[in-house]
Structure formats: C-alpha cells, structure tokens
C-alpha cells in the first residue's frame, strides 16, 4: 500500500497555513480525503502548490519488530499504537502468522509483508487504507463500488498490456534454513510445459524456519499457480466516480479488449482523481487480469 495523497494549488491572498496543518477535501458533502500538509511550493505569481498525505504517510517510519503467532490485524494494531495513530475498523484476518521478523524496515512494509503472508496462507486478499482519519482493513470482496465503467459508460481511453517479463515464473525454489545440517532444505516445483514455451523463469526465496515440509510445499505450489502465466495489465482513463478508491472492486465492461472480452468485477490497484474547471476525471490501474 501507499499513502493517499491530495495535490492542489491556491493563490496566496491572506491565507495562512503551515506544514502539519490538517486538510479535509469533500465533494457534494462526501468526505474524500483527510490528511495533513507536507509540502508547499510557491512561485513568483503567489500560486502555492500543496501536497498533503493521509495517515498512512506516518507508517513510512522505520522500525524493527518480531511477531510470533500474531494475525495481521494484531500486528497493525500494535504498530498503530506505537506510532500513536488512530485505528478504525480492522477486519479479523484469522490466521496467526508463525513468525514475522523484520529489522529496520518501514512500518508500511512490515504491514504489507504480514498481509502478503496472510494471502499466501489463506487465499484471502485484504485492503489496508486510511478511511477518513482511521486506519482500516477489509477483505476486498466486501469493497464493491457502485457504477460501471466501459464502452458505453464513462470510459474515455485505456492501455492494455500482456507480458511474461516481470512477474512470470515457471519454476519456484523455496529454501528453508536447517540449523542441524548447516544447509538449506530446498523445495522446488516447476512446469516443464511452460519452460519449453518461455524458457526457464525461476524465482528463489528463503522461508521461515518455523514452517514444516507440508507448509513449504503448499506455499511453493500456491506461488507457482500464481506466477506461472502470462500477465495482463490494464490502465483506464474515464469520467470520475466520486469516492472510488484503490482496493475496491469495480465492474468493467470492455468487449474486444485485445485477446479477451472483459465484463466482470476488477480490483483497482491505483486510483487518481482530477477535479478541474467543474470536470471530474480519473485514471486507475486494474489488478492483473489473469488468464
């Protein structure tokens, strides 16, 4: 995840504000953003460009943590308390992470790692975000946006890409340190068919010593299932939907999208809104579309 950001400019005419001041942005009475001023840039014509961030910005603080048998929700609560941040509705992720040890990492990276481990173990994907000044965690399946974007509704342009360049792997090797032998126990799964098609694309990672053989083997199979494919990415430009945010599911209706026809709910990874001269537009990136 990344902090929510608000950028705007104003003419300096008797307005006085400083870094750290709170900022609220609402549209038609709906609170869209609550954050704080971090950057001010002024030009010779007294126009001030302002950049504000929400509460997730403070999670860039670096720290070291050792968690054993704690759920992602419990980890978020402890970090929020340590940083004196406000926690709101945090959904119970249910699965205790056997071990999570991270040194001198940003708290946002620590939380992201906890959620990634939860995804690999349970298959459940969660969205972590600031909801009007309160840290929130929800399963993506419960965050369905209203509205449709497509050829007959709001869509103005899109960019669709297919590749095997960045996230595609047809061989997974997981290494678990073994203190008794002084060597790593290596678990490997491959797809010989796709190795013949694309060449050997291998991912190698170390895993926690607390995981048993069955858990490591299951993790390797899950990783191969996810990475062993061609990836499809979609970027969309459209007229704006107020309140749409990253982490929500949105219905997209784009027939004849290259090699596929798209009509389904899609997860939004990044959303950017622009309000200018009474016109509201948005750009968003869709999570990889799958085979």
Regions found by a protein language model. Name each.
Residues 9-42, 71-82, 112, 239-265, ...:
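Short, acidic/charged, Gly/Pro-enriched secondary-structure junctions
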Residues 31-36, 49, 64, 186, ...:
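Well-ordered beta-strand positions in beta-sheet-rich domains
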Residues 1-59, 149-161, 233:
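Assembly/oligomerization scaffold segments
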Residues 68, 283-291:
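Glycine- and charge-enriched low-complexity intrinsically disordered segments
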Residues 12, 54-56, 89, 178, ...:
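Non-catalytic surface loops within mature trypsin-like serine protease
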Residues 9, 24-26, 38, 51-53, ...:
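Residues in well-ordered beta-strands of folded domains
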Residues 14-15, 112, 116, 123-277, ...:
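Acidic, small/polar-enriched beta strand-loop surface segments
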Residues 44-163:
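Charged- and aromatic-enriched interaction segments used to assemble
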